[in-house]
Amino acid sequence: MTSTLHTTKKVLSIQSHVIHGYVGNKAATFPLQYRGWDVDVLNTVQFSNHSGYAHFTGFKCSTEELVDIVEKGLIGSLRIKYDAVLSGYLPNVQALQKVAGIVGQLCEGSENVKWILDPVLGDNGRLYVDRECVAVYQDILQNFKIFLATPNQFEMELLVGMSIRTLDDAKQAFKLFHKKYPRVSRIVVTSLELSEFLSNDTYVVAGFDCSASEEIFFYEIPKINAKFSGSGDLISAMLTDSLLGDRRCTQLSLSASLGQVLWLVTSILQKTYDLNIAERGPQDSTIDIKDLKLIQCRDILKQDLIPSIGKPKTIKI
């Protein structure tokens, strides 16, 4: 009798945590585990629920606690070998600097460790963190080896120092990002509201593989009549799985991975919307959906053969 053995991929996910709901680590952990990853979870904060609710309570971990857990515990004492580190919200400038320094050294010391960095700064024109964190993230992106960065539109604008309103703006922003941050191998901007697509009631998700192409690619995604929390965290987690998971012998291109991830995430958002409408009844205006229905979307998450959301368009840079 013969058997095929494979090693389960292991990821350290450093993000926020909520007791109720699905953002940060709660949006990443179950989907990654359900798709076969061994996930070590480091919670940078512990809140009752996310800040999109009217009220929340909880606490932030201190810089010393976070550093001790990663440096002395996981790496120093246990000597755990990770395939990937997925980092998101960190509560202050010092925590961001210290944790990024440890993760950066870990990735510099081993080609096998890939850093997926979600530079959590804010959204919709509003900062979630101290303004000093912008400069810290710029320094991190300049000096460390990043496998994939996943900013949203607002974060991309902060990182490159320009507004993005049109497709040409997006092209210039990607060019500037690559010039400023040459150690970042791949970038996906998880949501772009561009003037060319507003009449179509669509938004754009765009990417660039700095090592493999001179073209930006983008997918045009139909809008769902709702505001979601946690969708960006889910995209980052599912890109980690699609690009680095053990389901295939050869790594997919960033463009192909993003097409599959967008199909999966959009399917989850649509099912979440449909379940909310079933509970609330038909709605004429945009509804605020606080939490993704991840448990109810197990049938979507378990698929091995994920279709693409469509064919991407490309722009030469």
UniProtKB/Swiss-Prot annotation:
Binding of ATP, residues: 190-191, 220-232
Keyword flag Metal-binding: yes
Catalytic activity of the protein: pyridoxal + ATP = pyridoxal 5'-phosphate + ADP + H(+)
Keyword DNA-binding found: no
Enzyme class: transferase
Required co-factors: a divalent metal cation
Pfam families assigned: Phos_pyr_kin
Gene Ontology CC: one annotated term: cytoplasm
UniProt GO BP: pyridoxal 5'-phosphate salvage; pyridoxal phosphate biosynthetic process
Molecular function per GO: ATP binding; metal ion binding; pyridoxal kinase activity
Subcellular location: Cytoplasm; Nucleus
Subcellular location, principal: cytoplasm
Residues that bind substrate: 16, 128, 233
UniProt keyword list: ATP-binding, Cell cycle, Cytoplasm, Kinase, Metal-binding, Nucleotide-binding, Nucleus, Transferase, Zinc
InterPro entries: PM/HMP-P_kinase-1 (IPR013749), PyrdxlKinase (IPR004625), Ribokinase-like (IPR029056)
EC number: 2.7.1.35
Further remarks about this protein from its record: Present with 6580 molecules/cell in log phase SD medium.
Family listed: Belongs to the pyridoxine kinase family.
Record function comment: Required for synthesis of pyridoxal-5-phosphate from vitamin B6. Important for bud site selection.
Protein name: Putative pyridoxal kinase BUD17
Provenance organism: Saccharomyces cerevisiae (strain ATCC 204508 / S288c)
Organism phylogeny: Eukaryota, Fungi, Dikarya, Ascomycota, Saccharomycotina
